């Protein structure tokens, strides 16, 4: 345990450097300076004059480039896109101060570690981090992975832990290999699902929440719409980095497209028993040991909707039952890949807990899975939409297999542009929904601890 006197001494003498002032870099810069650390930052050199004016009143110091950050900093954090990490470390890494500590914030650590090992001076320690949440989420209580990859100086690890303590996150210690496997297991399939959903809606040019109570109405639909739009309100590289640079993610995204295709084939071939057997096996594998409360309940699911319609003012019109192919394919993928999503809850992002929650709800709410299978076989109201969804899932799988950031960016931004007019409202509702769901899941965890 580091003494308070030691931490105060570090704050008075040490400098934290941040290369890259995107959303997460800025979050770290503000959190660290608010906690009393000296922070020096830079972004791309051509933005210097603009950012100097923008952050004139900020507590951190802004300099022109990463060379100036690297020469002065005792802990350097590269907060840059995964696609650029190697190039940027190659440029600024050799300027690192003697004996400094270096880390990064990318969502896939293999290329980051490779860049550090290749371009950093041998006297640098490598202790890297990953906050498993977005910049709009409160850092308190969220998972923060710390990877002590190379430490020659005993105080280095204690120092990084002391710096990160101001985030009030749950610190999790992993190797970079463990980190990459876990992030793929918890994010690759679920991101593919909601990217494909948004892509399918954009292709058929509909905002699903505007169609009244007939289609895409109700609790599960609220979450699907809100999460899909939340993903498309972020920057494309947030998801591209994980999907393209993480080898484990490739297999999982391919499996998601395969699961969606195979389940859809069973639906259109009217193979009800085969579909039922397959989904019950998936249910047993993923949820067989589940006890206690569900992560989500009806009250939360019904509360947050973009739709202006309601059952009460629509002549008692009932929503058309949905096949929920996108959610069925998530659970089937976990089953086919042998992934137990509950194994990684300590490293789960806020969005992953919601993905797991809606999947849990669909498979464990009494009668709902059976109703969903019945709708998939006997009610063809969603068949055209499901076909478009399968095409979108396969497209995303192909984009990832090409490992081309430009193609990924183009695909993502074309869908983003379609939803752009709706994103501000969706973000407001989505933020409230996420806050409520995370609070509910914390309450559930506390209740289960009391009962054990």
Swiss-Prot record:
NADP(+) binds at residues 14-43. GO terms for molecular function: NAD+ binding; NADP binding; prephenate dehydrogenase (NAD+) activity; prephenate dehydrogenase (NADP+) activity. Induction: Presence of Phe represses the TYR1 gene expression. It comes from the Eukaryota. Its EC number is 1.3.1.13. GO terms for cellular component: cytoplasm. Present with 2180 molecules/cell in log phase SD medium. Belongs to the prephenate/arogenate dehydrogenase family. This is Prephenate dehydrogenase [NADP(+)]. It comes from Saccharomyces cerevisiae (strain ATCC 204508 / S288c).
């Amino acid at each position: 345990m580091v003494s308070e006197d030691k931490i105060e001494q570090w704050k008075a003498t040490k400098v934290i450097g941040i290369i890259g002032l995107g959303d997460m870099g800025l979050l770290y810069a503000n959190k660290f300076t608010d906690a009393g650390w000296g922070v020096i930052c830079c972004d791309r050199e051509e933005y210097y004059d603009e950012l100097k004016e923008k952050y004139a009143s900020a507590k951190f110091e802004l300099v022109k480039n990463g060379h100036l950050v690297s020469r002065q900093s005792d802990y350097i954090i590269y907060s840059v896109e995964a696609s650029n990490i190697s190039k940027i470390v190659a440029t600024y890494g050799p300027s690192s101060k003697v004996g400094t500590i270096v880390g990064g914030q990318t969502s896939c650590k293999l290329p980051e570690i490779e860049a550090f090992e290749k371009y950093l001076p041998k006297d640098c320690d490598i202790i890297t981090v990953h906050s498993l949440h977005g910049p709009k989420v409160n850092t308190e209580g969220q998972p923060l992975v710390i990877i002590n990859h190379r430490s020659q100086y005993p105080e280095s690890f204690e120092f990084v832990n002391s710096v990160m303590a101001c985030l009030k996150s749950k610190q999790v210690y992993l190797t970079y290999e463990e980190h990459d496997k876990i992030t793929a297991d918890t994010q690759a399939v679920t991101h593919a699902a909601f990217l494909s959903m948004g892509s399918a809606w954009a292709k058929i040019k509909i905002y699903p929440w505007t169609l009244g109570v007939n289609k895409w109405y109700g609790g599960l639909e609220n979450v699907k719409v809100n999460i899909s739009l939340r993903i498309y309100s972020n920057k494309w590289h947030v998801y591209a980095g994980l999907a393209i640079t993480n080898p484990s993610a490739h297999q999982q995204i391919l499996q998601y497209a395969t699961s969606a295709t195979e389940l859809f084939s069973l639906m259109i071939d009217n193979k009800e028993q085969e579909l039922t057997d397959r989904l019950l096996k998936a249910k047993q594998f993923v949820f067989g040991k589940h006890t206690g409360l569900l992560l989500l309940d009806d009250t939360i699911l019904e509360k947050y909707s973009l739709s202006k319609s309601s059952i009460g003012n629509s002549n008692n019109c009932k929503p058309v039952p949905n096949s929920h192919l996108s959610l069925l394919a998530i659970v089937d993928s976990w089953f086919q890949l042998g992934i137990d999503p509950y194994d990684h809850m300590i490293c789960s992002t806020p969005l992953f807990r919601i993905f797991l929650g809606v999947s849990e709800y669909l498979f464990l709410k009494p009668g709902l899975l059976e109703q969903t299978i019945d709708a998939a076989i006997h009610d063809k109201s969603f068949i055209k939409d499901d076909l478009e969804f399968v095409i979108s899932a396969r497209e995303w799988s192909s984009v990832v297999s090409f490992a081309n950031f430009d193609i990924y960016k183009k695909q993502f931004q074309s869908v983003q542009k379609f939803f752009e007019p709706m994103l501000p409202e969706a973000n407001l509702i989505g933020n409230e929904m996420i806050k409520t769901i995370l609070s509910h899941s914390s309450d559930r965890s506390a209740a289960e601890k009391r009962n054990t």
